A protein has these predicted regions:
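Class I SAM-dependent methyltransferase SAM-binding "motif I" and its flanking Rossmann-like core
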Residues: 177-223
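Glycine-rich N-terminal segment of FAD-binding domains in flavoprotein oxidoreductases
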Residues: 61-92
Length: 661
């Protein structure tokens, strides 16, 4: 069973010479916008092996030279695979940790019994699995009183100095551009100190340590301490890190992105995979730094970029514009700027359709979806019980109105995203109507009292009882059914899959299993769809979206292995959610909406009342989900309009997934 197919999706085929130049001259040209040495690996696995090579080499050199190697280690999620690789090297006798001295980069403070500890995590991940001597492991003393905190920090720095300073720092570039717990605003010369854990970093802590409530403060080595090391290796993996990697590597060093201070270090290296590097100039806009290897997507991206730079629509771009912005080779390749303009304009125009299921009895040569068969059987997979309407509510309504047989499959219950107050309101209503509806039974009254007592005694971070989770899940089911009914989806076509991996009761979910994939596979087999819509949030901050997508892709893969001929005729479209939209160079289908259709979509999203103002996982975006969706859809329409195409109120965009075989 292939459970990680989403990680193998490559929207771009990036020429190897862009990310792995063959010589120093080529590197100097390609990387002239980069202010710190940056190594791009095709995959995270390749980057992990490269980092492990450097760590092993550093250990051997320093042990041979002075009898020990002093390393500061972080415990962010990005570093974990490096530790796994180092353990493998140790077991294969490729490295010896007997003379390695370890300093903990950061530690939560103050601490209580049972509270999370980064040192415990580091011990579980690496230290206990190799031959590092206990006396060679150093961490901040969490028992220091707050009044003695300054002296405690200085004492920790003195321990580092007594060991001869740090030979190596191994850490991740955090989601906020942080190094260790040095959040935005940290000074270049900052020392070891107590720091507040900001809201963005706190969410990554919740995920890494499987917590409901993150510690508010921590002790961290400062930027100055990190830059004092002889070598710094920093890493970042995945598309969700692309924006911060660009800021750290190419933008001016700034306190707003502490990782950008790596630019000031003479022996710092940033190691990223292609996904995390996608906004670097040599990957995103290679025509600015080298002779470009043009393909249709790259051409579309370049012309959209040129329109943004000039403020002109596609068909008004001139040869002078191409020359001024370094795209003269593209114009020369096609004979003239006009020829490029026409090609790209037609290419993008053909993505627009008001018939997402295909227009019956029409020439479909230049349409994103085929005309036949009609009507089509369609499955829309929704990770949570509102992602369908948030991400593609306008498209879903069109599919229903155009008489396709539309099924909606809610992959998870979404129960942990219902607030206690919302759930308690339903209990109060049932208490008031129980006599009239014959619910005044001993069992109901017992359950009602148990729930009220549980809520009264509940503390932040406590896991909900099974009864609470069941009730919250039923609330989300009812909201989803209401929304589907509002759109005209048949009741029998609404499927609640309740995939087992989700049902842990905590933020941290289980691993995708054969049970999950079988549930999805059985549904697909029973419907035999001509179209499948699936979440394409490959940088999903929740994680659930990606796991749900992997479940669908694994099921499709198994069906193809089983020889399901009808599956070969099924087209799979990926949508994106409330966080980001597909880039213009990737969009293959764009479904427009009028003001009335956008208003209908908003009203459909509002059927999910538990996900409004008091929803637990709104993140640090102050906008509600319907506002995020509208802003995103309007921005897509505005982009099309700015390129000189038809002007719509809003648009939903899709990319076709071709099964990886």
């Amino acid at each position: 069973m292939k459970t990680n197919l989403s990680s193998q999706i490559k929207l771009d085929l990036v020429p190897k010479r862009y990310y792995a130049p063959e010589n120093k001259i080529e590197y100097a040209s390609l990387c002239r916008e980069e202010k710190v040495f940056t190594q791009i690996s095709e995959t995270a696995d390749g980057g992990v092996k490269s980092l492990a090579d450097e760590v092993v080499e550093t250990i051997k050199k320093n042990v041979e030279k002075k009898g020990k190697c002093v390393i500061a280690l972080g415990t962010g999620n990005s570093v974990l695979p490096v530790y796994t690789e180092l353990i493998s090297r140790y077991e294969n006798k490729e490295v010896d940790f007997a003379d390695v001295v370890v300093f903990n980069l950061f530690e939560f403070y103050p601490t209580e019994a049972g509270a999370p500890s980064t040192l415990d995590r580091l011990n579980n991940l690496l230290l206990s699995k190799v031959n590092i001597k206990p006396e060679n492991v150093h961490s901040f003393n969490q028992e220091v009183e707050k009044v003695d905190l300054y002296e405690g920090c200085r004492a920790y720095e003195a321990e580092i100095d007594a060991c001869g300073g740090l030979d190596l720092v191994l850490c991740e570039i955090g989601v906020a551009g942080n190094l260790a717990f040095n959040a935005p605003g940290s000074q270049f010369s900052s020392a070891c100190r107590m720091t507040l854990i900001d809201s963005v970093i706190r969410r990554s802590v919740l995920s890494a340590y499987d917590l409901e409530v993150a510690p508010a403060t921590a002790i961290t080595l400062g930027i100055g301490n990190i830059l004092a090391a002889k070598k710094v290796l920093a890493m970042a993996w995945g598309e969700n890190q692309a924006k911060i990697v660009k800021a750290a590597v190419e933008d001016k060093a700034s306190e707003t992105v502490p990782a950008s201070f790596l630019q000031m270090h003479r022996n710092a290296k940033v190691v990223v995979d292609l996904s995390a590097a996608e906004r670097l100039t040599r990957i995103c806009h290679p025509w600015l730094v080298t002779l470009c290897e043009w393909n249709n997507k790259m051409i579309r991206r370049a012309i959209a970029w040129l329109c943004e730079k000039t403020g002109k629509p596609i068909l008004k771009l001139t040869s002078n514009d191409y020359n001024e912005y370094g795209l003269n080779e593209l114009a020369a390749q096609f004979g003239s700027a006009y020829n490029v303009n026409i090609k790209v304009f037609n290419d993008i125009q053909h993505t627009i359709t008001g018939w997402p299921g295909g227009k019956p009895d029409a020439d479909d040569t230049d349409r994103p979806e085929r005309a036949k068969p009609y009507p089509k059987r369609v499955i829309v997979f929704s990770p949570h019980p509102d992602d369908d309407v948030i991400s593609m509510g306008g498209t879903l309504k069109r599919l229903v109105d155009q008489k396709h047989d539309v099924h909606v499959a809610y992959e998870t219950s979404g129960n942990i995203a219902v607030g206690d107050e919302d759930m308690f309101r339903y209990i109060l209503v049932m208490d008031q109507i129980k006599k009239e509806f014959g619910l005044d039974t001993e069992l109901y009254n017992q359950k009602s009292e148990e729930i009220k007592k549980f809520l009264a005694a509940k503390h932040p971070g406590d896991v909900d009882s099974l009864d609470l989770r069941m009730l919250k899940g039923r609330i989300r089911r009812a909201e989803a059914k209401t929304a589907c009914n509002w759109m005209g989806v048949k009741p029998e076509n609404v499927h609640h899959l309740d995939l087992p991996f989700y049902e842990t009761g905590t933020i941290k979910k289980g691993d995708l299993s054969e049970r999950d994939v079988k549930i999805v596979k059985d549904l697909i087999s029973s419907v035999k769809p001509h179209q499948i819509f699936v979440a394409g949030d490959l940088a999903d901050p929740h994680g659930t979206h990606r796991v749900c997508t992997d479940a669908v892709l694994a099921a499709i893969d198994e069906l193809l292995d089983d020889g399901a001929e009808w599956m070969k005729e099924c087209r799979i479209w990926m949508y994106r959610g409330a966080w980001a939209e597909w880039e213009i160079d990737h969009i293959e289908m764009a479904v427009p909406m009028s003001p009335e259709q956008l208003r209908f979509k908003r009203n459909t999203i509002l059927k999910h009342q538990s996900q409004m103002e008091n929803a637990p996982f709104l993140g640090d975006d102050d906008r509600l989900f319907w506002q995020r969706a509208e802003d995103r859809n309007r921005a897509t329409a505005q982009l099309y309009s700015s390129l000189g195409l038809a002007s719509y109120e809003a648009m939903e965009a899709f990319v076709e997934y071709h099964p990886i075989r």
